[in-house]
Amino acid sequence: MAKLLRLNAIDGDMPGAGEADLFTLAPGGKAYVPFAWGSRVLGCKPPPAHGAARERGSVSLRPHQKGVLKEAWGHVTSKGYCMLKCPPGFGKTFMALELWRRLGLPALVLTNRRVLATQWRDSATRFLPDSRVFTSGTPPPDALPRDLYVTGPASLRNRRIKAKDSPAKFLLIVDEAHQLTSPVSCRVLLSVRPSHLLGLSATPMRYDDYHAALGAFFGREDSTVDRVDPRPHEVEILSTGVHIEPEFSKITGKMDWNSVIKAQSDNPERDAALADRMLLRPDVKWLVLCKRVDHVKRMAETLSSRSGKKVDVLHGSKDEWDRDAWCVVGTYSKAGTGFDACERTGLCLAADVDRYFEQCLGRLRANGGTVLDPVDDLGVLRKHSKNREAVYIAAGCTIKKTKCDASRPSQSTPTPTGSSQPAPRTRRPQR
């Protein structure tokens, strides 16, 4: 999603921040620059869109989505670009599909996971039954308005899509845009030249220099449609009693974070304590998130053996799961972001998570879900727990703090340290 500019048309510095160079040089004294940045420099407007009369399926937009779509439509048709910043479950996919329908242009969706590509295909055929969905490649020059191409950045790496190989006008949708503005993905984005651009993310932020890429490609705050949708859940913050002894680098002296995750993952007593706590809620359909694949497998075995219930796993190349299973265990990378499992009513954080936690909490799509949030005995883990607690408070969750001795699973039933109460009045845990 680049603009091709002559270098002599650029007054000032090229786009970038810190270590992030957000441009690539082209022959003839030109450069490919991020879409929104280039549009501002050129002062150009997008070409007019000619909506096609396409019939919707059985899915219709909800009132709160119509207001968001109206704002997004204004940005895309007047500037050419927009960022939809809406929480998980708000309906960003369907709003993007409706905007595509109204534009009447072929579309390309960039997403970084196959499971998300499958969800796009299924959503498109539900929402717009006449859609032709292709899960590889990019729109050719003769692509039709009903043609939707869904692909990953890896397939476009080392390619430059020439203007003559693409439609004169097409919409580019970037799903989970915060993930697709990494150093490698930015080079891919600079190889695509759409006429209209839409970014989707519940958390459009990065923790490195490439945070600047989000504004350069999708526009600043005045091009962002921002919504919140608090969903109160019942949260149990469980002090496990497990003491973590991290390792430290002999060279830098810094904590080896992998050693912390390994200590959490290689603790069968801790797994059993979590399983026993989850069994106290047999009516909840759990999603358990882990960092390591070996932990996913062991946790699934523990849950299956202690419950006698159906347990499924999600990791690696596995994209399908049993929606009737009592518990689905997956990695954060597989099931923590963009994962659409509306049937899940419980979330267990079997390994620590800090950044982008809002994405994980968003896997619970309905109000009144259950969250089991274990906290081990280590300063940085307690700090991450406080960060997650702030997210719970913002969502209006009810928080209950308990403790257990995870070294003795047979006695692992949590003991309350404070009564259940609304989040704003949550007590601090005793130290």
Curated annotation (Swiss-Prot):
Tree of life domain: Viruses
Top EC category: hydrolase
Molecular function (Gene Ontology), one example: DNA binding
Chain spans, region Disordered: 403-431
InterPro entries with a match to the protein in the record: Helicase/UvrB_N (IPR006935), Helicase_ATP-bd (IPR014001), Helicase_Restrict-Modif_Enz (IPR050742), P-loop_NTPase (IPR027417)
PANTHER family: ATP-DEPENDENT HELICASE IRC3-RELATED, TYPE I RESTRICTION ENZYME ECOKI R PROTEIN
Residues holding ATP: C86, P87, P88, G89, F90, G91, K92, T93
Pfam assignment, any one: ResIII
UniProt cross-references to SMART domains, sorted A to Z: DEXDc
Stretches assigned to the Helicase ATP-binding domain: 73-222
Motif segment (DEAH box): 175-178
Name of protein: Putative helicase 055L
